[in-house]
Amino acid sequence: MFFNRKNTNLFFKFTLLFLFLFLLKIIPFNTGFEDSIDYLNNISFTISSHFKLNKDNKLKFKSSSSCLNDTLNKYKSHLNFINSHNKAIKAKNDFIKLSDEEISSYSMLSYNEKISLLNNTNYSLEDRIHIFLGSDLENFSLVYYNISTKEKVSINENKEFKPASTYKLGLNALIYNLSLNGKLNLNDTITFENCDYEDGTGLLCSKSSIGTYTIQELLDLSIIYSDNIASNMLTRYLGGRDEVKKELYSLLNINYPYSKSTITADIEYRILMYIYDNKNLPEFNHLIEVLTKTEFHDRLDKYIPQEIVAHKIGSNESYIHDVGIIFSDSPYILVIYTNGIAYPDEKIAQISKAIYNNYN
C-alpha cells in the first residue's frame, strides 16, 4: 500500500509545507509584525470556524490522489473565502461585512468561540452581537453611544419592553429637574401609605414601621437599593406613574404615549443623555454618584471597573435590563433591554465587556 506509516508522514509534511507557503502568499508584507500576527490570528479563527479543524477530525486515506484532491479543494475553497475577506480588511474603524448567510453559518460555533468573535473588532458590533445572541436577538435591544466620538450603534432600539426598575432612573431625573426649577424641595418629606407597599427589592419592605422620609432619602434608596416602596412614595407624590412619564417625556421632547406601560432603549438612551448633559449641576452630579454605588454588579459592570459605571438595573420576571453611563477614558452610554433570553445577566455582562475592551 502506498499509504504506509512512512508515506503518511511524508504526506503530512507536504501538507504542512503547502499550508506554510499558502500563508506566506496571503499575508500582506507591507504590514508590521504585530499586524501580521493579528492577521494570522484572524485567519486561524476563520479556519477553525468554517472547517471545524481539531484533534478529532482525522483524514481517512483511500488513495494518494483522492486524499490530496480533497485537501487541495478545501484549501482552494477557503482561499477564495479569505481573498474576498482580505479586500474588506481596511483601516481602523472599518469592518468586514458579513452576509446573512455567513452570520447564520456562525451559529454552529461553540459558546467560547462566540465569545472570541464578540471581541473580534474586524467585524461590526452589530454582526458580533447578532452571532453571539443568535435567535435571542429578536428579544434584545441595545443602544451604544460614544460621547467623545459620537459613534452610535442601535439594535431594535424602538422595540417595547416593560421597564421594570429602570423606570426609577427617569423618575430621579424628573425630580432633580423639578428641584432645579424650584417646583419642589428635596428636603420636603413624604409619609408612607399602605398603597405604597410593594415587596421585592429595597430596604423599606423589611421595616415593621416605614414612617416618613425626605425626598432626597427616597431618591437615594430608589437607586442604590432599587427600593420599590421608595419609588412608589415618590411616584404618588407626583401624581402617579402616568403623570411622571407625561412630565418626563415633555421635558425630553419624547413623542411616545405616556399611558403605555412600556419603554424603549431609545427613550432610555435619551434619559441617560439628559443626565450626562447636566452632570455638572450638583443634583445630577449626586445622581451619577449614587448610580455608581448601586448594590447590583452582575450585568454591565460585572467584568469592568465598577467605580466608572453609573447604572440602573431592571428585573421583572422574564424582563432583565441594565442601562448606564460608563465613565471610561472615552465615556459612553450603554442601554440593554431583554425579554426571555437565555442567561440574560451573563450575556449583558459579556457584551458590556466587549464594548469596554474594544472601544476604550
Language-model-detected regions and their locations in the chain:
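Short glycine/serine- and small hydrophobic-enriched flexible loop segments
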Residues: A173-N181, R270-D277, Y356-N357
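Short, conserved catalytic-motif segment at the N-terminal edge
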Residues: E138-E160
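Short Gly/Thr-rich strand-loop-strand
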Residues: L291-I313
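Active-site-adjacent helix/loop patches that line small-molecule binding or acyl-intermediate pockets
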Residues: Y111-L125, S206-K293
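Structured C-terminal helix/loop/strand segments within mature extracytoplasmic catalytic/sensor domains
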Residues: F2-H130, G134-D136, K152, D242, ...
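Active-site-proximal beta-strand/loop segments in catalytic clefts of secreted hydrolases
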Residues: Y145-I147, C195, S222-S226, Y237-L238, ...
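Short, well-structured active-site flanking segments
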Residues: N177-D196, D242, L281-N285
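Active-site SXXK
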Residues: K150, F161-I190, S222, L334
